[in-house]
Amino acid sequence: MAETAAGLCRFKANYAVERKIEPFYKGGKAQLDQTGHYLFCVCGTKVNILDVASGALLRSLEQEDQEDITSFDLSPDDEVLVTASRALLLAQWAWREGTVTRLWKAIHTAPVASMAFDATSTLLATGGCDGAVRVWDIVQHYGTHHFRGSPGVVHLVAFHPDPTRLLLFSSAVDTSIRVWSLQDRSCLAVLTAHYSAVTSLSFSEGGHTMLSSGRDKICIVWDLQSYQTTRTVPVFESVEASVLLPEQPAPALGVKSSGLHFLTAGDQGILRVWEAASGQCVYTQPQMPGLRQELTHCTLARAADLLLTVTADHNLLLYEAHSLQLQKQFAGYSEEVLDVRFLGPSDSHIVVASNSPCLKVFELQTLACQILHGHTDIVLALDVFRKGWLFASCAKDQSIRIWKMNKAGQVACVAQGSGHTHSVGTICCSRLKESFLVTGSQDCTVKLWPLPEALLAKSTAADSGPVLLQAQTTRRCHDKDINSLAVSPNDKLLATGSQDRTAKLWALPQCQLLGVFTGHRRGLWNVQFSPTDQVLATASADGTIKLWALQDFSCLKTFEGHDASVLKVAFVSRGSQLLSSGSDGLLKLWTIKSNECVRTLDAHEDKVWGLHCSQLDDHAITGGSDSRIILWKDVTEAEQAEEQAKREEQVIKQQELDNLLHEKRYLRALGLAISLDRPHTVLTVIQAIRRDPEACEKLEATVLRLRRDQKEALLRFCVTWNTNSRHCHEAQAVLGVLLRHEAPEELLAYDGVRGSLEALLPYTERHFQRLSRTLQAATFLDFLWHNMKLSPCPAAAPPAL
């Protein structure tokens, strides 16, 4: 039966990349435009621009020097973006078009650490690691001011919101805030009240008050008339950013009066709202479950009423400013992707485990992201139940969790369990129905966890919290770490793969040992049951994949081809093929019957830890240490259909070409023969044209009416013809037409013309020398002919007398 099913299925021949989820933010500054439609963030050498509504990457801006971006800022009118690189160059961008309008040297002696525009969008201030502050007029294109006096890195600069006051504020590593007068070109005041680095400066709407925050766990309110402190508010956390809120009531945030209120973000990982007058905290954001994530950045887009925060693991969160309701989540950088799975009954989502305690769920169509909190240490593995609504995760925190996605795509934790004494490195769900799951740990044990009926009927919106799971069976299975588990399609068998170089087969639910698979030279990374045959596949660090018979535990086949460890293996094409991923970043497609590698796919740059195939077997998803998540599509049928269409088109064109040659319509025949890539037919057409008494004129007219790509192909054909003395005359005739009628600049613009000319020269010289010798010989024969004279016949002797 399995053989019949495998015979009816079509073998896959190729996969193509359909979509990539790549890092777009690796730390540093992130900024919203005033409308809240676009998000700007730094990623290495680029500034990426995202559409906030869809999450799509619209454009990447990269300077010509291809050095890391150290700072950037968007003007208040949203028209100009300026970036600074490690090469000490400033670039002014028309960011909507993606073009650089001006590039100039920063004049700083060290990289630019901070920059800010004034309210008029005409002045730009840059703070350097050399302790200097410079001001630039980006309209007139010149430097206006150069302020010195700050010790060390100037990591913070800000203009006063009132452009008529011409004041610039800066802060360096000495924890003080300097006030610079652009009018007097001097330092007006040095504000010293912080005892650690100042992290942010924000101004009231009238510009009479400034709020500063620091890592000394205080926020200070300053009077900008007297440059004195009016209030020092202890906030009991290291503050990375603070924002002055609009002076209007916001009941959802505990703001009941129109006095001065501000919001802080820091190492506690939550947003808090403070009343400046009393120094009291009036609102505290609810703490997310799981490990606390430090907030590293916070900024307010007043016109859009949006608040942007950034977490330490590079997640960007957008809130509604007046209520702090979460609107959008973006995963800027997933670091090392450890596992990835399709999610949902129609595989509409994927769930990703990266080098983080948080899980990320992406909707594939829109790439909308949902970040799941719960684990307190790095999540190591995932698995999904058959229907696609429930999935399980395990982590280094020695716990497991079960998550449920509702029909709206929202995911919540519905169950959790603990009992292992070391990190839980692998997890596997039951296959027939949602009845149990199995976990394997570094404590060398396997646990079987039955799912209670209450869990399956439980709504994710319930307030009673996650159901607690209890292990039914615990068994010590190996002597070293258990790296992989697999449950058979009938839920009766369990396979385990370990670092001890063996795989074992167990009977469920009591975990009774049935047999051991031995033969690999190094540890096993993955085990998988065939969906149709009684076969087990194992992937090992020795670079091989082995197929084993479940009846007698013998090795049936060994697949060799990976140059490094094989990390994952999956059955595709109804069990007739294998798809594997390795630590060299390669994916390989194998046909089991022939034992051959059909295709090698190269799109990752590092280890591919995650590999999962969709329920319809037409897509695959991979995730690797390069932080890339790639969606692959089976393009076998599409390529075969395309190849069939090409063959049919070739037959039609060939018939048309034969008809044209029969009718002696050489111009169309020449163009068609070139498009069919038939050098011999093209040669035949040119020979037929040259047999005509008016060959030169007809050949010129025919060649000159060809398209440029056809002329390029004809020139390549000439290179081949020119190597043969029998066909060199046609090649030279075509070359002569091109040289006489095409300008040198046009010829040099041809694709591959330099290589063609280099190949033509030696044979052309050889043909020229041969013809010269022939001409010389012919001339010599002619000379001999004209100089040959016959001796006169002797006269008859007179008769004798």
From Swiss-Prot:
Any Pfam family from its record, for instance, is: WD40
* SUPFAM superfamilies attached to this UniProt entry: WD40 repeat-like
Question: Gene Ontology cellular component?
Answer: nucleolus; nucleoplasm; small-subunit processome
Q: Which residues carry this modification: Phosphoserine?
A: S257
Gene Ontology annotations of biological process type: ribosomal small subunit biogenesis; rRNA processing
Record's InterPro entries?
Answer: G-protein_beta_WD-40_rep (IPR020472), Utp13_C (IPR013934), WD40/YVTN_repeat-like_dom_sf (IPR015943), WD40_repeat_CS (IPR019775), WD40_repeat_dom_sf (IPR036322), WD40_rpt (IPR001680)
Outline the WD repeats, range by range: 64-105, 107-146, 149-190, 193-232, 245-284, 290-329, 332-372, 374-413, 419-459, 477-516, 519-560, 562-602, 604-642
- What main location does UniProt list? nucleus
* Matching CDD domains: WD40 (cd00200)
Q: Where are the N-acetylalanine modifications?
A: A2
**Where found, per UniProt?**
Nucleus, Nucleolus
Entry keywords, A to Z:
Acetylation, Isopeptide bond, Nucleus, Phosphoprotein, Repeat, Ubl conjugation, WD repeat
Q: Glycyl lysine isopeptide (Lys-Gly) (interchain with G-Cter in SUMO2) crosslink - at what positions?
A: K407
* Biological function: Part of the small subunit (SSU) processome, first precursor of the small eukaryotic ribosomal subunit. During the assembly of the SSU processome in the nucleolus, many ribosome biogenesis factors, an RNA chaperone and ribosomal proteins associate with the nascent pre-rRNA and work in concert to generate RNA folding, modifications, rearrangements and cleavage as well as targeted degradation of pre-ribosomal RNA by the RNA exosome.
Q: Which PANTHER family match?
A: TRANSDUCIN BETA-LIKE 3, TRANSDUCIN BETA-LIKE PROTEIN 3
The annotated subunit structure for this chain is: Part of the small subunit (SSU) processome, composed of more than 70 proteins and the RNA chaperone small nucleolar RNA (snoRNA) U3.
Which named protein is this?
Transducin beta-like protein 3
* Organism, scientific name: Mus musculus
